[in-house]
A protein has these predicted regions:
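Charge-rich, low-complexity N-terminal segments
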Residues: 1-116
């Protein structure tokens, strides 16, 4: 059985060396959908009886693990030296240094790894 939940957040990023305007600093409203696969709880005394996982618990886990860290941040690739230096010069700026170029695909990979 699978259940899917969705949360949203806002963040800035850029794709260094991209051929189009994605190489410029810009932002998006992101949506993250997480699908959880498991067995339905059959123990009638368990508060999750009849569920794979309580949606509230799933959303809280995703919120704490990903959304709170990435929301209203600038996500910068660790090897994007020019932008990283600029962001580090700002006081109290919410910067997330990313191990990969922050494309949607790589953000999904990092999110999946964080949720394992």
């Amino acid at each position: 059985m699978e259940i899917t939940t969705k949360l949203e957040f806002d963040a800035g990023h850029r794709i260094p060396h991209h051929k189009s305007s994605c190489k410029n600093l810009h932002g998006h409203r992101y949506a993250i959908e997480v699908t959880i696969k498991g067995e339905i709880v059959v123990d009638e005394l368990n508060s999750d009886f009849g569920m794979v996982m309580d949606f509230k618990d799933a959303k809280e886990l995703i919120k704490k693990t990903i959304v709170e860290e990435w929301d209203h941040s600038f996500i910068v690739y660790k090897d994007d030296a020019v932008v990283l230096k600029f962001l580090q010069s700002l006081n109290d700026h919410k910067t997330v240094v990313f191990p990969l170029v922050p494309t949607a695909e790589n953000m999904a990979l990092v999110a999946m790894d964080k949720l394992k």
